[in-house]
Amino acid sequence: MIEPIMSPYLTFDRQHWAQLRNSVPMTLSESDLKELQGINDHLSMTEAVEIYLPLARLLNLYVAARQSRNGVLHQFLGNTESAPPFVIGIAGSVAVGKSTTARLLKALLSRWENHPKVELITTDGFLYPNKVLTERGIMHKKGFPESYDIRRLVEFVSEVKAGQPNVTAPVYSHLTYDITDEMKVVDRPDVLIIEGLNVLQSGMDYPHDPHRVFISDFLDFSIYVDADSQLIEKWYIERFMKFRQGAFKKPGSYFSHYTALTEAQAEQKARSIWETINGKNLVENILPTKGRAHLILRKGLNHTVEEVLLRK
């Protein structure tokens, strides 16, 4: 373990972090991992065992501690209502691997007996519909804070946190690049994972609006998936090129016109999108929230985690 002077984090290299697994068994198979990983992620069994099992163990301990505290409070108050869910936020750039991290943690955490019901929600579902974004002239800023229906997202998390049954969340389609008519129902989970670009934004980002409420106000634990911006740009372009050969060709795909581009044109387009939208959003809105996370997963080449930072 490396502990930089004056750092609010404990820093672990891969070897030392892996030792914190503490003999927790791996309950997922190679085929399970293949289903969980994103199109451009490289999730190996070694990565799952050495990085994500220790993290799942840590989260299990946090959840157990919260459940114990809730039990004491309920006993004191004579309250028989079910405890609120433990809410985990996962933030980071586009193409850094947030979704794979979220899906893997959901699968691992649901194996523990004291919190078997784990739900995963992405903030994509709370983007404004394309029609609204177009009317407001911010279609080019999709993914930026102003493109989200924050009020609706906060209401959703608040209702789930309050223990309300059958809370609904809108569903986003990456195929049509828009909100669908489908709704996801979340019914009193033990753990709720919220994955999205800006889940760690707080009042520090909006000092002029002291009464604004944020998703970060409801988080019990937060994770930031980090990597060098040049690496993320490389991953984004690689993912774009793979989508061009697959998802972009599907009927109804919003991005079908990109399939007509040559290889060089497609790569140039992906780089342009990164520089004008995703890279800009990372620098302006996402990266500044990294230091608020309870835990940071620092990735290197091939999407493998090289370092873990845990807040003291």
Swiss-Prot record:
<keyword id="KW-0418">Kinase</keyword>
<feature type="binding site">
    <location>
        <begin position="92"/>
        <end position="99"/>
    </location>
    <ligand>
        <name>ATP</name>
    </ligand>
</feature>
<keyword id="KW-0547">Nucleotide-binding</keyword>
<dbReference type="GO" id="GO:0005524">
    <property type="term" value="F:ATP binding"/>
</dbReference>
<dbReference type="GO" id="GO:0004594">
    <property type="term" value="F:pantothenate kinase activity"/>
</dbReference>
<keyword id="KW-0067">ATP-binding</keyword>
<dbReference type="InterPro" id="IPR006083">
    <property type="entry name" value="PRK/URK"/>
</dbReference>
<dbReference type="Pfam" id="PF00485">
    <property type="entry name" value="PRK"/>
</dbReference>
<protein>
    <recommendedName>
        <fullName>Pantothenate kinase</fullName>
        <ecNumber>2.7.1.33</ecNumber>
    </recommendedName>
</protein>
<comment type="similarity">
    <text>Belongs to the prokaryotic pantothenate kinase family.</text>
</comment>
<keyword id="KW-0808">Transferase</keyword>
<dbReference type="GO" id="GO:0005737">
    <property type="term" value="C:cytoplasm"/>
</dbReference>
<dbReference type="InterPro" id="IPR004566">
    <property type="entry name" value="PanK"/>
</dbReference>
<keyword id="KW-0963">Cytoplasm</keyword>
<comment type="pathway">
    <text>Cofactor biosynthesis; coenzyme A biosynthesis; CoA from (R)-pantothenate: step 1/5.</text>
</comment>
<dbReference type="GO" id="GO:0015937">
    <property type="term" value="P:coenzyme A biosynthetic process"/>
</dbReference>
<keyword id="KW-0173">Coenzyme A biosynthesis</keyword>
<dbReference type="InterPro" id="IPR027417">
    <property type="entry name" value="P-loop_NTPase"/>
</dbReference>
